[in-house]
Amino acid sequence: MVDAITVLTAIGITVLMLLMVISGAALIVKELNPNDIFTMQSLKFNRAVTIFKYIGLFIYIPGTIILYATYVKSLLMKS
């Protein structure tokens, strides 16, 4: 049977991965030409992209380290 810590760890890893993907996509969109259709000249869209850009910048390295450490831990637990 799976314990609560394993379930919470899996949920945490999933949320962190989704946030990293969304933030990475925001970084890509932010670097596009300002006249592109993706920017849509919308203040709310640009504000959301900027927020995800900063989140992506601040969690990229720690998030990657956490995901790697969790992966190594799961490998060690299996053997």
Swiss-Prot record:
It comes from Vaccinia virus (strain Western Reserve). Residues 2-8, 69-79 are intravirion. The chain crosses the membrane at residues 9-29, 48-68. Belongs to the orthopoxvirus OPG081 family. The keyword Transmembrane applies. Induction: Expressed in the intermediate phase of the viral replicative cycle. This is Protein OPG081. Residues 30-47 are virion surface. GO terms for cellular component: membrane; viral envelope; virion membrane. The lineage of its organism: Viruses, Varidnaviria, Bamfordvirae, Nucleocytoviricota, Pokkesviricetes. Keywords: Late protein, Membrane, Transmembrane, Transmembrane helix, Viral envelope protein, Virion. The keyword Transmembrane helix applies. It is a multi-pass membrane protein.
